[in-house]
Amino acid sequence: LNHYSVDVDYLISGRAPSALFDMSAFGEYQWRQGLSFATQNGRVDYFNTYRQNSFKQFWSDVKALDLSTYDLILTDYEPVTAWAARLAHKPCIGIGRQYAFKEPSLYSKLSLLQRGLIDYFAPASRWLGMHWQPLDNCIPPIVREQQSETELSERHVLVYLPFENLEQVVDALIPLKSYQFSVFHPSIKQTDNLDAPHILGFP
C-alpha cells in the first residue's frame, strides 16, 4: 500500500509490546490489548482463552477507535479494527489464514463453536483467505518476490509452528545438527541450530 502512495495507519493487538519484533516497517503504529487465543499443544484452549482476555477492555477499545477519517479497513483477523469497522459501517477486508475457513468445503467441517469464532472474532464485509490448497476466494501464502541477498541454502529451514508445544518442537529439531532452523514461535530463543527469524533475516 505504501508503494502506491496510500496513506496507511497500523494498529497492532493481541501480543504484549515487549513481545513484538521487527516493527520499524510500521512506523508509529498504534497498539491495543485486543484479544488472543490461549493454546495447548497446537489446539485452542477455550477455557483459558476466555479467562485470559479482558472483554471489557476490548469493547472499550473498539468503541473508542475513531474511524471517521478512513476509507477502508484491512484486518488480518485482528478484532479491534474489524469490530470498530462494523460499528462504524466502514468497509472492511479481512485477509488471512482464518478467513479461508469461510469457504464452504472447510466451513462445513467446523463445529458450531469454531464457526462462531470464524464468523465473529474479526468480522469483515469482504474477505480473502490464505490457503496452501486451491480454493475459491483464497490465495496461497504471500512470499516476497524480492529475495534476500543472502545466499540460499537447502539446509536453512523455516518452521512455522507458533501454537505447538515448544519443548516438543525443539526436541524434534535439535538432533538435526546439519540443518539451521528459523522457528516462528513466540517463546523461541537462540539455541544451537535454532533461531528466531525476523523480516529481513531469512533468505
Task: Give the residues covered by each predicted segment.
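Generic beta-sheet signal
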Residues: 11-13, 95-96, 130, 184
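Conserved nucleotide-sugar phosphate-binding/catalytic loop shared by glycosyltransferases and other
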Residues: 3-57
